[in-house]
Amino acid sequence: MNLTLDHTTLHRAAKYFMDSGKAASHEAAMNLLQQFGLTIYVGEEIRSSAAHQIALLTIVNVTRRTLLGGVEVIGLPDCDSLTALAPNTGLKEAVMALGGTPVAVARPEWPTALIGSVEDYSNKDTAWRVTWEGWRAGAAPLMIGDRLSEDNSMALAPALAAAVCAGEVFSHYAGDHPMAGRRTAGLSLWQPGADWLDVDESEPELAFLPSNLWIIGLGNLGQAFAWLLALMPYETPQELQLVLQDYDRIAPSNDSTSLLSYKHDTNKMKARVVADWLDKRGFTTFIEERRFGPWTKRHADEPGVALCGVDNALARSALDQAGFPLIVEAGLGGGPQAFRSLGIHTFPSSRTAAEIWAKQVALADTSTEDMPAYQALKKSGIDACGLTQLASRTVGVPFVGLIAACLAMSELLRRLHGGKAFEFIAGSTATLQDIEFGTLHAPPYAHGYTRAMPMGWPTAP
């Protein structure tokens, strides 16, 4: 189905090539994305390891939204899906439902990602290993050879590894980082800023999980939060009480950025789509379909921890006025130079939310209307209002949102396990080795928790 180009249908990764001048038209930008593809090889571990399945399903879900040439999987056996990401189905069916294609032969021109023990694979010159251990995860080029133990001790790690690999593949295709495909890239969620390849004996095995959360905003970040919650080893998913707050509807463009959005859900309320997805995985959800702002007040019986993923400075500046004892906010950059940027803030902190964001409320975004792609649209007859709306949309890719969501979610898990509390974390997926942060003293986590299944993983409800 061909959709009229407007701000609701614009592919947000295509916008990067339009805004940067790499593509002279929207059609040229889409043609570029349609040349991007990925071959994923899976090892024998995929049959019995939920961690490896999480890595596979995550990288398929993330990359198929930006690599429009296709995502193909080699070595996929007939076996059950072991996680709540794809309940009551086979793994092949789960991969296909997310947009991947099981194949027997690789396309030689596509780069390669390896998950598990794979010995025979194509395109060894442009290939990454998706790897993790404990709270650390990333992607390592095969030419370098680094590999971690790929254990089951921390549920977020394989998802983080998949997202990092997706980012490296995109940079390889975009040609905007000379080291993409020639460097390792990763993060420690226990010690942000530490070398992710170094063994860290202080990392605990995941033992506790939050039991009450309020998610504000259900776009790119909010849907990434939901995806990660489904990875968590809740013995009884119903123990997690979730308030889901968003007033917006799904647009076709959300398919390019948000992990639970599909074009067939266009015009459905985001909160209802996300709630339905979580309900099917056994969680308990409550919907709040109104804007967040200074008028929002939490009741004492409602979740005391808020995960915020809105991109609105006015809403952000009111975060600490709603009565939440703990808030973890995640934000993303938006322009062609900043779309890989991410930031995490927690409250209470040394600054109020208004001090951080009030000045951004009235700031105007830098215009890209003079770039060739927008001038081509102007010549094609698009009106001035439509052109301004298109130019004002942010560049967006799902792997940045998922990495930011991993950092936000790990803030809760770290505090639950007696680790450091961070006031802010800032960085870019292009330079994960240069994460900046500030720590603070925080009281013990007292906002509701449940025990994780020991060395376990979620199973389909």
From Swiss-Prot:
One GO biological process term: protein modification by small protein conjugation
Keyword Ligase annotated: yes
EC number: 6.2.1.-
Class of the enzyme per the UniProt entry, highest EC level: ligase
InterPro entries from the UniProt entry: Ubiquitin-activating_enz
Result of altering residue 385 to A: No longer resistant to SECphi27, does not form a covalent linkage with BilA
UniProt keyword terms in alphabetical order: Antiviral defense, Ligase, Thioester bond, Ubl conjugation pathway
Gene Ontology MF: a single term: ubiquitin-like modifier activating enzyme activity
Amino-acid biosynthesis is among the record's keywords: no
Active-site residues per Swiss-Prot or TrEMBL entry: 385 (glycyl thioester intermediate)
Function recorded in the entry: Component of the Bil (bacterial ISG15-like) antiviral defense system, composed of BilA, BilB, BilC and BilD. The Bil system specifically conjugates a ubiquitin-like moiety (bilA) to the bacteriophage central tail fiber (CTF, or tip attachment protein J) via reactions involving E1 (bilD) and E2 (bilB). Modifies CTF of phage SECphi27 and SECphi4, which probably interferes with assembly of the phage tail. Also modifies T5 baseplate hub protein pb3 (gene D16), but not gp27 of phage T6 (Bil defends against T6). BilD (E1) catalyzes the first step in conjugation. Expression of the Bil system in E.coli (strain MG1655) confers about 100-fold resistance to phage SECphi27, SECphi18, SECphi6, SECphi4 and T5, but not to SECphi17. When cells expressing the Bil system are infected by phage SECphi27 at low multiplicity of infection (0.03 MOI) the culture survives, at 3.0 MOI the culture collapses at the same time as cells without the Bil system.
Name of protein: Bacterial E1-like protein BilD
Species the sequence originates in: Collimonas sp. (strain OK412)
Gene: bilD
